[in-house]
Amino acid sequence: MGTNLSVPNPLGFFPDHQLDPAFKANSENPDWDLNPHKDNWPDAHKVGVGAFGPGFTPPHGGLLGWSPQAQGILTSVPAAPPPASTNRQSGRQPTPLSPPLRDTHPQAMQWNSTTFHQTLQDPRVRALYFPAGGSSSGTVSPAQNTVSAISSILSKTGDPVPNMENIASGLLGPLLVLQAGFFLLTKILTIPQSLDSWWTSLNFLGGTPVCLGQNSQSQISSHSPTCCPPICPGYRWMCLRRFIIFLCILLLCLIFLLVLLDYQGMLPVCPLIPGSSTTSTGPCKTCTTPAQGTSMFPSCCCTKPMDGNCTCIPIPSSWAFAKYLWEWASVRFSWLSLLVPFVQWFVGLSPTVWLSVIWMMWYWGPSLYNILSPFMPLLPIFFCLWVYI
């Protein structure tokens, strides 16, 4: 029949055909169906799908034969089930039986109660079972190598797992500081605008501030002088006001830092020579002696009087710069020295001072609050500098 190409039979009668005359069946050439040397074509019994059109199989009875395929009868042969798998590796394997202890650990069979007690007398082994100083029989001395034995065990097992609670608490502090810093930054950025509003309100007492830069020719709608657009003629004045406000804020911070350093005694300013308006500029100016201990600031200033001898004047441990300014102002303005007794008397009357402060706060408090409210965000920063410096 030829080579089997595994192609479905489109006509449906090979090899179950009965057209014996066509194949000249005789005694020498028997019927093809009975020929033992015929080519077993496994797909010959399968009628090609759509060979004669969609869903049409012509009747082949009589002319093409009487087989089920020739008659147009399609029989479905059930597929043979797959052979049973003998591979047990796909599922969960049963736990194999444990071999005897004498085969897996032959050295364990050599231990007995005497050998165990003898080994237990070793201080390194005993330290693992009994605390230092403890004993089961009372005859064994305390272990001496407890720390080394435990350290050797820790070196094998690794470091302990870090405590997550400590890690969380360590991260919580920086996060809170970051949040507080961001909050203060947003508040500090509002200081220039608030001061600008206060500045412009001085020109419109009792009225609503309106930008004076707009005119009838401009197409700009009415707006506040603190929110001028770039095309407004008052925009340059708004920028100038805010620049001056930034300089004032910077100067205020520097003054506070200077006062703080002076209060801490970190400004070693030499005082004035008694009876003079200036400090000495001679060679003795450089002979300052360091302070006691490890401080980097000098403890005294050497001045050169008229007789040529050096005189050491101690530097105040606190408010050195303030005292220097007061001495300098007292020399320049002699009438300031007359205020010292009055100030000392006024400070000594503590009830009077407190009543005066209360009265001034009650009378000028609301207006002072409106003036000082923009500077409120700076107070936490000043407090932190005062505490940590």
From Swiss-Prot:
Residues 109-163 are annotated as: Pre-S2. It is found in: Virion membrane. Residues 2-108 are annotated as: Pre-S1. Keywords: Acetylation, Caveolin-mediated endocytosis of virus by host, Fusion of virus membrane with host endosomal membrane, Fusion of virus membrane with host membrane, Glycoprotein, Host-virus interaction, Lipoprotein, Membrane, Myristate, Transmembrane, Transmembrane helix, Viral attachment to host cell, Viral envelope protein, Viral penetration into host cytoplasm, Virion, Virus endocytosis by host, Virus entry into host cell. The keyword Glycoprotein applies. Isoform M is N-terminally acetylated by host at a ratio of 90%, and N-glycosylated by host at the pre-S2 region. Glycans are attached at N309. GO terms for biological process: caveolin-mediated endocytosis of virus by host cell; fusion of virus membrane with host endosome membrane; virion attachment to host cell. Residues 85-95 have a biased composition (Polar residues). It comes from the Viruses. A lipid is attached at G2 (N-myristoyl glycine). The keyword Methyltransferase does not apply. The chain crosses the membrane at residues 171-191, 243-263, 338-358, 365-387. Residues 73-107 are annotated as: Disordered. Systematic vaccination of individuals at risk of exposure to the virus has been the main method of controlling the morbidity and mortality associated with hepatitis B. The first hepatitis B vaccine was manufactured by the purification and inactivation of HBsAg obtained from the plasma of chronic hepatitis B virus carriers. The vaccine is now produced by recombinant DNA techniques and expression of the S isoform in yeast cells. The pre-S region do not seem to induce strong enough antigenic response. Residues 2-242, 192-242, 359-364 are intravirion. The large envelope protein exists in two topological conformations, one which is termed 'external' or Le-HBsAg and the other 'internal' or Li-HBsAg. In its external conformation the protein attaches the virus to cell receptors and thereby initiating infection. This interaction determines the species specificity and liver tropism. This attachment induces virion internalization predominantly through caveolin-mediated endocytosis. The large envelope protein also assures fusion between virion membrane and endosomal membrane. The middle envelope protein plays an important role in the budding of the virion. It is involved in the induction of budding in a nucleocapsid independent way. In this process the majority of envelope proteins bud to form subviral lipoprotein particles of 22 nm of diameter that do not contain a nucleocapsid. The large envelope protein is synthesized with the pre-S region at the cytosolic side of the endoplasmic reticulum and, hence will be within the virion after budding. Therefore the pre-S region is not N-glycosylated. Later a post-translational translocation of N-terminal pre-S and TM1 domains occur in about 50% of proteins at the virion surface. These molecules change their topology by an unknown mechanism, resulting in exposure of pre-S region at virion surface. This is Large envelope protein. The lineage of its organism: Viruses, Riboviria, Pararnavirae, Artverviricota, Revtraviricetes. The gene is S.
